Amino acid sequence: MAKHEFALMDHVPQSGVRYDQYEGDHLICAVVDDDAIEQHLPGFEILPCYAHTVDIPCEGLCYCGITLIPPHAAGEMYRMVSHDSAFGELIPMLLRAEQEHKWIIHFGI
């Protein structure tokens, strides 16, 4: 089964830098099955995020690419999935990102 990976970033993404292969210290990693992501895609479309770099704003997750999720969007995502056990590893990461003002990087399928 296809998986989506998420990691808490150790720094704020910088303009002009692509994060196609983020190699920073991942403080926490979470894996979510594609089926669970697909069920929530319509709701995720309202999340203000960035595609590969903070220079390319987008809405929602880049399903097949890299998404940079800012802290406020992580909080919104947390409220969408906190009741869904399929997001078990990701739920505490989303909450931590919002509370500690950290970014999350998402690696799509």
Give each language-model segment a name.
Residues 1-103, 108-109:
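Acidic (Asp/Glu-rich) sequence patches and key acidic residues
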